[in-house]
Every structure is written in structure tokens, then in C-alpha cells.
Curated annotation (Swiss-Prot):
One GO cellular component term: peroxisomal membrane
GO BP annotation list: peroxisome inheritance
Predominant cellular place of this UniProt entry's protein: membrane
Origin organism lineage: Eukaryota, Fungi, Dikarya, Ascomycota, Saccharomycotina
Subcellular location: Peroxisome membrane
Protein name: Inheritance of peroxisomes protein 2
Keyword Membrane on entry: yes
Membrane-traversing stretches: 215-231
UniProt topology in membrane: Single-pass membrane protein
Residue positions the entry lists as glycosylated: N79, N275, N343, N344, N379, N517, N569, N574
Keywords associated with the record: Glycoprotein, Membrane, Peroxisome, Receptor, Transmembrane, Transmembrane helix
Summary of the function given for this chain in its UniProt record: Required for peroxisome inheritance. Acts as the peroxisome-specific receptor for the myosin V motor MYO2.
């Protein structure tokens, strides 16, 4: 045989099906093809010419060494241009047909879909939107997962790094274009090959009488090889599509979570800027209006873009969903269908409404993906849900009627094409939100340098105020103290840093001017500031009228005490009133003293200004809030105890008066009857717990008399 002669039609059973290249085709293979890379789904195209065909050489110009490689799983390794004839030995004359057939049909193409759909649903259910609390703890790790596709395939493990021409594999004709991007051509149609093989085997069984003839064995082996290749190619195609679908869904869910987190941060920042006047009297951001407008534009742009994108792709997804399952998932995850209809058909202008409808539509899209019809049960659909969907999406019924017959692989390909467009929009929105991230962490020093002109300041003091700068010095010292690692002790370097900061603060404070008159103090009347219950606005507190200013108390001044005679009843009532207001007066003096110190040290002026909560950390705010709540709770508890004690003594006095009236005792007789050793006003009653003893003693005295 010469070197330029073509090989024979059949050198070994079945080898010519996947080892020979047809030189008659000039532009490559033009049947159904698949392309695989890390970002794009495999596309199945028919009778189309790819632009990278021009880089391939003609099969007649290829050498056998450039086509056949050892990493190809189904090609017989050979460095010769032709295959030598194979002689069947006696050991292979009686081989086991059952073992061969079982190995051929071991990997069923349709079994991949069910395994994939379980992982598909699990990834969506454990996402950030449907399982907010525990999504980070419910990651799925399987030994046999769709995501292990690259690990399980010997061919994909050994992909050459550069472009190579066509290689024949059991998955189809393979070409590596660039950056390990694979192009597959599926040259066996699964269904047509199975049907044709079944018909041929039926005819052979009917007309072939010699069951052990060599020719019959060659034909059967040829048919089995064709069936095996068609099964492998269909299995590979379905497996690859499921893998790319799950990969794209996870990327979309991750991008949705990132965008949702950024939108939430911007929304919180927007609320802080808008409501800062209700939290504090001091505004730390001089360009708050400009920042609020930028944040609002970002939120409106992001919410509107994502909402209308979801509104355009959901009608294409919901036609593949089972309406019965969709209604169950909507009920499970709290999606109100009338509310969905309202937000999808009406125009929303406020920002909160835009964010709410976006969140609602994202959850509904995930419910549609969870309820994909994998069994083709169109007769078991929910009529009420279908009618509602027809109202929400006017062309829903028309799309359902135009939908092709049940084909899960085709459904996944359509879903992935829709999610690819959504993922590109999410990436754009995320980039835009990240570009303006500095607004989330804007401080007064940063915002003041960004503006060239001075703006009207809503603060009662300017940014150049000496007290404000001193507070910033203290804040830096506090941060340095918190940064010290106390486990290793305070080092000399840490000590020097703190001392330098303190010296700078002392120098600054000495050079600054003392402004304002701090000698005047004000005292709030306790009669006008009685706390009637628990006030909800803890940060703001209750407002009380200011009393006129008084002079400072002199401790050296002599105080004259006047003795006043009083009766028994009057003394008892006065003692009760003194006990009732004793604690409260003490608290008022303490609070007045603290307010006085606060005015002197913090402001240096007459008016009392509340501390700035924006300069405090989360732990400090939480600590101040807890202290305020505990203080108010203690005041309420003490007030209730004083009121209960006063009522109890009032009942005691009424019982004593009624007993004297009932028996008609005069003054001396009453004294003899009750055998009182001293007046009741002189009896020291420490608390309410002593009242039952008084009742019991009076009862005993009454029985003895």
C-alpha cells in the first residue's frame, strides 16, 4: 500500500466511524455543534459557519500525529497513517455479549437531568432571598455533583493550551480554538440512531439464520459502537448543559446578593442623611443635600433598571413553570399575588415603593425557577394561578400556546440565555454602585475638602470651632487607646504615642480662647418634670420648661431652721410626702448637676446641647441606649413603689378613722383601747412590707379589747 493511497473502508470493526476525516469538506463540519468555555453556555447550532473555521486546516493537510493524541479517551493510539488489520484470536472468539451491552448502556443520558434539578432547586432555596437567616450554613457538598463535570471528564482535564485542529472523540468532533475554548460537533443524533439500530437489529434477527457467523458479529459490533457513541454524545451534551445552567444560576444569585447588599447600605445611608435632624442637633456633613440626591439617583436607577429587566424576562420563564407548584411556593415565601399584580401594573414614584417592588419581583422570579415543569404535567395546572398570571402578564396564554413540547434540556438553554442578560445588567449596576462607595463612608473632614465654596452651616457652631477640634483630638486618642494590644502590655512606643497626642491636645487647648459664660447654671423645677410613664423617644427625651437662673449656692452661708408645731395627722402626712419626694429630689439634684457639668465642659455656653451620636461607635451608642433605658426603668419602678406606698398608708388611715367612728371612742378611750405607746407619726415605717404587720397588730389589739 502506498503512502498517498486512501485507507480501506473497514480495517477494524467500528473504527472508521470516528477515526477517519472526510477530505471532501473544505470548511469543516457543519452539523450540530457545541461550544464550551468557562463563561458561555454550550450552543447547539445547525448548518451555520463559525468565524473561527478559517483558522482550521483542511483534513487532507493534517498528519495523523496532529489528530491522534493519548489524552483522547476513545481514539486508538497509533502513529501510522493507516491501521493494520486485526486478527481475532481464539481467546476472543467466545466473548461475553452481556458484559459489553451493560457497559454500553451504563450511562443513561436522561438520568443526569433529575440529579441536576435537585441541585438546581437546593441552590435557589438556600439563596440569600429565600433563606435570609441560614443561607451561609446550608452549602451543599456532594460526591457526585454536576459541578464536578470537569473533574470527571478525562478529555476536559487534558485540554491543550493552544489551538489545535479537529480531534475525534466519543463526545464528537473537538477543536480547541483559543484559551481552552472547546468547540464540539455532535455527529450522532441520539433518537435517530437508536431507532435505526433497533430496526437493523430486528431485520438481522428475522433474516439471518447463522447466529455465529463472523459477518453478523461485525455488523452487530458496528451497530453497538454507533449506539455507544450516540449515548455518550447525548450524555455529554446534557451533562454539559446542566453544568453550565447551574453555574450560571449560582453566578446570578451571587450577583443578586451583592447588589442587594449595596442597595441596602445606600438606603440606610439615605435615611441617616434625611433623618439626622431628628437624631442630633448637629449636622456633621456640610453637603448632605448633595449626597442625598446622588444616593437617591443611584437607588432609583438601580431599582428601575433591575425591575424592568426582571419584568421582561419573567414572562419567558413563567411559561415553563408548573402553576400548581408556583402557587405553593408563592404561599410558602409570602408572595401575595394581588400585591404582585398591583406593583407590576401601577406606576410607583416613591423610593421605598420602588425598592419593595424590586424585592417582590426577585422573589417571584426565584419561585418561577423552583417550579419549572420537569414532568410535563400540563393537565394538573392551577387554574386560578393561570388566570392571575394572565392578568399580570397579558401575553401569558399566547406564550404558553406557542411553547414547544416538553423538552427539559431546551428549557434549561432558554433559562440560561435569559439569566445571561440579567447577569450582565447586575454587573453593570454593581460597578456603578461601587464607584460611588465613598459616599457611604463620608466624614466631615472629607466632605469639607471636596467643596470649594463655603456652604450655609446648619450647626450652631462652625467646623473651625475650637471645641469641635478638641473633640476630634480626643477621638483620635481614644482610637489609639483602643488599638493597643493589652495582652502584651503597654509598650514604650504606645506610651510615647499617647503622650504626644495628649501634649498636642494640651497645647491646642492652652492657645485656644475661652468663649461663653459658664458661671450661670439653671435648675429645672421638679414639679414640672414628673415622668409620667416610659417615654418612647429615648434619644430625645422629654422637654421641660426652664426656670429662671439662680445664683450659685454658698456652702459657708448659715441656714436657720425654724421649729413648727404640728399635729399627729399633719406630721404623718408630711412624713409621707417627704418620703415620697425624697428620692426624686435627690435624683433631680444629681441630674441638674450633671446637666450643669455637661454645659460647662462640652459646650461652654448657657444652652444645653446634646452630644453628637454620629461620632460615637456602635458599641458606645448601644451602651448609652442601655444606660438610658435602665435609668428610665428605675425611675418608673421607684415612682410606682412610692405611689403604692402612699395609697397603702392612706388606706391604713381610713381604716383607723372608721374604727374610731364605729365604736364611738373619745380621745382618752381610744388611747386606752388601742394601748398606743407613742403616736403613729413617730413610728418609723421603713417600707411597704411593714404595713401587714401593722394590720395584724391592730387586729390583735381589737380582739383583746
Amino acid at each position: 500500500m502506498t503512502t498517498n493511497s486512501r485507507p480501506s473502508a473497514l480495517q477494524a470493526p467500528g473504527l472508521q466511524i470516528f477515526s477517519m476525516l472526510k477530505s471532501s469538506e473544505e470548511d469543516g463540519f457543519m452539523s450540530s455543534s457545541l461550544t464550551l468555555d468557562s463563561d458561555n453556555i454550550i450552543g447547539v447550532t445547525e448548518n451555520n459557519r463559525q468565524e473561527f473555521y478559517s483558522t482550521w486546516r483542511k483534513p487532507s493537510l493534517l498528519s495523523s500525529r496532529s489528530v491522534l493524541h493519548e489524552y483522547s479517551p476513545t481514539i486508538v493510539g497509533s502513529n501510522d497513517s493507516t491501521f493494520s488489520p486485526i486478527t481475532v484470536g481464539k481467546t476472543t472468539k467466545f466473548f461475553n455479549w452481556d458484559d459489553i451491552i451493560s457497559r454500553i448502556f451504563m450511562q443513561q443520558p436522561f438520568g443526569v437531568t433529575h440529579q441536576f434539578f435537585e441541585e438546581f432547586r437546593y441552590s435557589i432555596i438556600t439563596s440569600h432571598f429565600l433563606n435570609d437567616m441560614n443561607h451561609y450554613r446550608l452549602s451543599l457538598h456532594l460526591d457526585q455533583s454536576i459541578m464536578n463535570f470537569h473533574k470527571s471528564s478525562t478529555l476536559l482535564k487534558n485540554v491543550p493550551p493552544k489551538s489545535v485542529p479537529f480531534m475525534a472523540t466519543k463526545y464528537g468532533k473537538l477543536a480547541v480554538v483559543e484559551d481552552k475554548k472547546l468547540y464540539f460537533r455532535q455527529n450522532f443524533n441520539y433518537l435517530s440512531m437508536i431507532i435505526t439500530s433497533y430496526r437493523v437489529l430486528t431485520q438481522l434477527k428475522k433474516y439471518c439464520r447463522r447466529k455465529n457467523s463472523p459477518g453478523l458479529k461485525r455488523v452487530v459490533i458496528l451497530i453497538l459502537v454507533a449506539v455507544y457513541l450516540s449515548i455518550q454524545q447525548e450524555y455529554f451534551r446534557r451533562h454539559l448543559i446542566c453544568y453550565k445552567t447551574l453555574l450560571k444560576v449560582r453566578k446570578v444569585l451571587e450577583s443578586l446578593q451583592q447588589v442587594d447588599v449595596m442597595i441596602h447600605k445606600y438606603h440606610l445611608r439615605f435615611k441617616e442623611i434625611k433623618n439626622h435632624s431628628f437624631i442630633s442637633r448637629v449636622s456633621l456633613i456640610s453637603i448632605a443635600d448633595e449626597h442625598s440626591s446622588v444616593i437617591k439617583e443611584l437607588l432609583v436607577f438601580s431599582s428601575d433598571a433591575l425591575f424592568y429587566k426582571l419584568k421582561s424576562i419573567i414572562p419567558d420563564i413563567v411559561i415553563f413553570s408548573d402553576t400548581s407548584e408556583l402557587s405553593k411556593y408563592c404561599e410558602l415565601y409570602g408572595i401575595d399575588v394581588p400585591n404582585l399584580y398591583y406593583n407590576n401594573t401601577t406606576t410607583v414614584k416613591d423610593l421605598d415603593g420602588k425598592l419593595y417592588r424590586l424585592k417582590l419581583l426577585k422573589k417571584f422570579m426565584l419561585c418561577c425557577l423552583l417550579s419549572l415543569d420537569m414532568a410535563g404535567n400540563e393537565n394538573l395546572s392551577n387554574v386560578n394561578m393561570r388566570n392571575a398570571l394572565n392578568k399580570i402578564f397579558p401575553d401569558y396564554m399566547a406564550r404558553v400556546q406557542l411553547k414547544k413540547k416538553y423538552n427539559p434540556i431546551g428549557t434549561f438553554q432558554n433559562i440560561v440565555s435569559l439569566l445571561r442578560g440579567l447577569h450582565s445588567l447586575l454587573s453593570t449596576v454593581l460597578v456603578s454602585l461601587n464607584d460611588h462607595k465613598q459616599i457611604l463612608y463620608a466624614f466631615p473632614e472629607e466632605t469639607s475638602t471636596n467643596t470649594g465654596c463655603e456652604r450655609a452651616n446648619v450647626c450652631s457652631f462652625s467646623k473651625n470651632d475650637k471645641l469641635f477640634q478638641a473633640l476630634n483630638y480626643l477621638k483620635m486618642i481614644e482610637n489609639n487607646l483602643l488599638a493597643i494590644d493589652i495582652r502584651n502590655g503597654i509598650t514604650e512606643n504606645d506610651r510615647n504615642i499617647i503622650e504626644d497626642k495628649l501634649e498636642e491636645l494640651i497645647t491646642f487647648w492652652k492657645t485656644s480662647k475661652i468663649c461663653g459664660n459658664i458661671s450661670r447654671i439653671q435648675k429645672v423645677s421638679p414639679t414640672n418634670t414628673i415622668n409620667h410613664g416610659f417615654h418612647l423617644d429615648i434619644l430625645k427625651g422629654r422637654k421641660s420648661p426652664r426656670s429662671s437662673s439662680v445664683q450659685g449656692l454658698s456652702l459657708e452661708r448659715k441656714v436657720d431652721f425654724i421649729d413648727v408645731a404640728e399635729s399627729v395627722n399633719d406630721s404623718f402626712e408630711n412624713d409621707t410626702e417627704l418620703e415620697e419626694y425624697e428620692d426624686y429630689d435627690c435624683q433631680e439634684e444629681c441630674s441638674a448637676g450633671s446637666r450643669q457639668n455637661h454645659r460647662v465642659d462640652f459646650i461652654g455656653k448657657d444652652n444645653c446641647r446634646k452630644p453628637d451620636f454620629k461620632q460615637l461607635s456602635d458599641n458606645e451608642l448601644r451602651r448609652k441606649l442601655d444606660e438610658r433605658i435602665l435609668k428610665l426603668a428605675q425611675e418608673n419602678r421607684e415612682g410606682r413603689e412610692r405611689l403604692r406606698t402612699a395609697k397603702s398608708f392612706e388606706l391604713l388611715r381610713k381604716a383607723q378613722a372608721s374604727m374610731s367612728v364605729k365604736f364611738g371612742f373619745q380621745k382618752p378611750l381610744r388611747d386606752d383601747a388601742f394601748l398606743e405607746s407613742r403616736p403613729l407619726s413617730k413610728c418609723k415605717v421603713s417600707s411597704e412590707e411593714t404595713i401587714p404587720f401593722l394590720y395584724e397588730l391592730k387586729g390583735l389589739l381589737g380582739n383583746d379589747s
